Amino acid sequence: MNKPPTLETRASGVLLHPTSLPGPYGTGDLGPTAREFVDFLAASAQRWWQMLPVAPIGPGDSPYAAPSAFAGNPLLLSLEEIAKSGLLTKREIKPPRGLAAGRAKFSAAWAFKEPLLRKAFERFSKDANEAERQAFDGFRAGAACWLPDYALFAALKGLNGGKAWSDWDRGLRLRNRAALAGAREAHADEVRFHEFLQFLFDRQWRALRTRANGKGVGLIGD
């Protein structure tokens, strides 16, 4: 097994945001094509993959306009990897015609992925075994310094039609404790859905990083 490079050693690499990878779902993701790109880098004696930010995106689809420095972009979730876990079927993730074009289609990609991610969440909530539930709870505990606030923010952003937080109800935008607690309770399932997305992202990210490091390729953000 090769060792990943260190910043103290001179090495070359390639800059490529994962959404620029080819794929059938409108944008690249952390699935098969990302692994293939890692293999290509290793075979080409490249030691670094500079990925730019992989945080959630907002209006304009810029990775530099993220609502969180800790969360991952759910758009980068690989449906193929989720299907391998049994939460989706191959038939369900079959992409519609037109998504696999030469240019990224962020809105169309999310419009296709989001309902499937919600379906995966519903199945996980109903059918996950004890080991999977413990893994989810362990992730939530390990990310307790940022995940609860991020998941609540993401849930409220969607429930407010994507409006800026400054246009939300006064209690929420001023972070009134009672208002936040009430929102967290009223929208518990939606908050948990966003926690679940980050759980999936963490798993897929770690798997890709392990593969890359095993081939002597390091991952750099920006």
Task: Describe these PLM feature segments.
Residues 2-221:
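Acidic/aromatic-lined carbohydrate-recognition and catalytic surfaces
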